Each structure stands twice: as C-alpha cells, then as structure tokens.
Amino acid sequence: MKKVILIFVTIVLSGLLYAKENKSTDALLREIDGIIKNRQTYGAEKEARIADLKKLLLEATSDEQRYSFCGRLFDEYRAYNLDSSFVYAQRKEELAHRMDKLDYLDDAAMNMAEVMGTTGMYKEALELLGQIDKKTLPDYLYGYYYHLYRTIYGLMGDYAVTEKAKKEYYRMTDLYRDSLLQVNASDSLGYVLVMADKCIVHAQYDEAIRMLMEYYNKPSLDDHSKAMLTYTISEGYRLKGDKQGQKHYLALSAIADLKSAVKEYVSLRKLASLVYDEGDIDRAYNYLKCSLEDATLCNARLRTLEISQVFPIIDQAYQLKAKRQQQEMKVSLICISLLSVFLLVAIFFVYKQMKKVARSEEHTSELQSLRHLV
C-alpha cells in the first residue's frame, strides 16, 4: 500500500512539474536549439559580472576584501574556465597565508582539490585533501569537505578498470555520502540531492524523483540549482527505463546549464546521444558540437574525453547524411535539368505542330475562297 501511495504521489508531482514548465519535450528541444544559436548572450552577461568583480578586486583596500573577491571570482569561473578558477584558488591560498587564517587556507586548498577532481587529477586532489586536518575544520566547511571526497571517489568508481577497485571506491562514496547527510540541513538543496542520490543507488527511484520534484517546485530557484535537480531526476527516470522521462528532464537540465553560461556540463551531451538514437542526427550533431566547444573553452579535459568517445560516431553519421543529401540534390538537379530539356523539346514540337496547323488552316481558307469565286 505504501508503495502504491508513493507511486501516486510521484505521478502527481510529475504532473505538477510538467504543468509548471508547460512545455512538451519537443518544445524544450526547440528552445535548446534557439539558446545554442544565441548562447553568446548568456556568456556576455557572465563576462560582464567577472569584469566587475576584477575591478572590485583591484580597488580592494584589505586582504580580507581581496580574499572575498577572489572567492567570488572562483565561483564565477567554476564550471566556466577551470584554469582561471584554479588561479583564483591559488590567490586565495596566498592571501590566507598572509592573513594567517587556517580556515581560509583549508577553503582555498579544497577549491584547488575541486578543480583537480574535475580535471581528472584524482590522486593529486586526494593528496591535497589529505593534508587538511579535519579536527580543526570549522563547521561551515564540513559539508564542502565531505562533498569533495564523495564526488572524487564517485568519479574514481565510475572510471575504475577493475571490479575490485570500483567496489572499493563506491564503498568510500557511500561513507562520505552518509557523512554529508549528517552535516547538511534537511531542508537544503545539498541534502535533497545527496538523499536522492542515495535512494537511486538503492533502486528507490520513485522516492528519489518525488523528493527532487518537491524541491524543484520551490520558488526562486537559480538556473544552477534547476540544472542539478532536473539532471538527477533524469537519472532516476533513466534507471527506471523511462526514456521519455529521462529525455524531458535532460532537456530541462540542459536549458538551465546553457542559461547559466557554464561550460562544464553533462546534460546536453547525454541528450545528444538520446536524440541520435531516435534518428535526429542533425540535432545530435549540433548538441554534441556545442558540448565539445564549451568543454574545450572551459579546459574541462575529462568532459572533452567523454565527448570525444561519442563525437566521431555522430559526426560520421552527420557527414554521411550530408553527403547523401548532396547526392540527392545532385540527382534532383539532373532530373530537373532533364525535365527542362524534355519540356523545351516538347514546346518546340508543339510550336512546330501549331505552325503546321496554322498553315493548314490558311491553305483550307484559300481553297474555300477559290471555290466561292468559281
């Protein structure tokens, strides 16, 4: 009975979310097409914010202010340009040393570990995190600390070669996931995402979708929060075997990613694979091309590697389709040319026939005139 109620609640919440968006999946895909064409607009807005922060950093009169602005610049560059985000994490570390503030040093070290983890430097990231004394960490940094360990071990598990290593990395991921749940407030986005992730790991997909949708319906969510929520919802649907649900929420996640002008993302790449499987080669090519361009600009080497494994297949299909269309166009032009020739020949013969008829009528008229004279 409890399971039936849970499924019913999930369906109701799913309906509410669909109503909130009020768009079909096809409409969302068309929206993505438009955003990709005009994505420079969103990038320009982000660049303007970065320029303003850099100006404030130059005008700062104390190391405390400089540290704060470097932190905000790190946040802006996070998932936008990893090399630049690492530079500002290093600047934070320098300022923290100068101010002799241990919590600032730990925060800067975790910033650097985050960038290392995102670029696939897992060993270096763990070594850096291992230098942090957990006992001296202030309460406000515990969530970030556990989040980094959970994320890095999760990625290591995803890319592990042997089953033994994969099992061990996922065991560590589970431990840090539980630690995160203990330090995050139960009404926070972080808690909901981690709890939903735990439900998904334990095959409780409907429960995960229910809590994610419930949080998604809260007002005033920023694009980044929407992107994370809808991506996790799509994962729930994927594991349920619901491709349409997966596609719909991947589209919502991709829209939020593109609007927030991030360059390091997953949703659009996965959406490209889905639409490719459905035979929409042009759209798949455009989505994957956009993902590759953004990953390259961001210096997101791991994402670039993931895309490069799929791109040749879709690119080949796209080129074959383009070649086939060119051949069809050539055949059409040849057919049109032949038809034009036949038409000209037909017009010529009709014209000659009409002249013959005219001469015949003229001859007949002359004969009739002669008869009247006789």
Please provide the spans of the model-predicted regions:
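A "functional boundary" signal
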Residues: 4-9, 15-323
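Alpha-helical transmembrane segments and their juxtamembrane interfaces
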Residues: 12-13, 372
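Alpha-helical transmembrane signal-anchor helices
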Residues: 319-361, 365
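Single conserved hydrophobic/aromatic residue that forms the stacking wall/gate
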Residues: 362-374
